Regions:
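Patatin-like phospholipase
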Residues: 1-229
Length: 229
């Protein structure tokens, strides 16, 4: 409930304060990113209160990407805030985060659903909660940040399919069905409450029908689109 309430309060400007001036400024100054993560950092800090991995009640591992090597980097100790900012540093949108001599960006660049990392850490059963994709969108996003997010969403669905196919013989993998059809852009925060309601209702029904215990075929949300003529 606390997490849902946090999401309901968020507006796009709280996370992506993108304006015409910020885009022009990035070009004039030759920056490699459009937005400073100041507001995102404030949200994380006010929510986590300077939490450290070592003090958490449950083990947590955050995956980022080394921007120079392209390899996934699993962060499991130290400051959670820095790890999350690194893991969500969408290339071009946010700057890379420097940590222990490495430049880190969004984990989705190397592995959006880090099944491989979970297997390497010893997981025997993996439950994937995919964010889904805007499969009913009628036209592509018109600004750079929204387009970057949309493309990464497409990539994550493809990679999820490959990862499940590769690792399902080694560990038990369950993919919770995402919302479909979905027309909202990942850059659109105006529909958050409605999406939370739909997702909760659908997931409760899925759990009630034995979704977690089902031995049937895995539900993998492949990249797709609902075409309208």
């Amino acid at each position: 409930d606390r997490l849902a309430e946090l999401w309901r309060r968020l507006r796009r400007k709280d996370v992506f304060p993108l304006t015409l001036w910020s885009g022009i400024k990035a070009l004039l100054l030759g920056r490699d990113h459009l937005i400073e993560p100041t507001r995102l950092r404030r949200i994380v800090r006010n929510t986590l209160h300077h939490a450290r991995f070592e003090d958490l009640p449950l083990p947590l591992h955050v995956v980022a990407t080394n921007v120079l090597s392209g390899q996934a980097v699993v962060l499991s100790e130290g400051d959670v805030e820095t790890a999350l900012l690194a893991s969500t540093a969408i290339p071009v949108v946010f700057p890379a985060v420097q940590l222990d001599g490495r430049y880190l960006v969004d984990g989705g660049v190397s592995t959006n659903t880090p099944i491989a990392s979970a297997v390497e850490l010893g997981a025997q059963r993996i439950i994937v909660l995919p964010t889904g994709m805007s499969c009913a969108m009628l036209e592509p996003p018109r600004n750079m940040a929204a387009l970057a997010l949309h493309v990464m969403g497409l990539q994550s669905m493809r990679q999820l399919d490959r990862d499940v196919a590769h690792y399902s013989s080694q560990v038990h993998i369950t993919v919770v069905p995402p919302l479909c059809p979905l027309s909202a852009s990942v850059f659109d925060f105006s529909q958050t409450a409605a999406l939370i309601y739909r997702a909760a209702k659908q997931t409760y029904e899925w759990l009630g029908s034995g979704g977690l215990d089902s031995s049937g075929p895995l539900h993998v949300p492949l990249a797709h689109h609902h075409y309208r003529r």
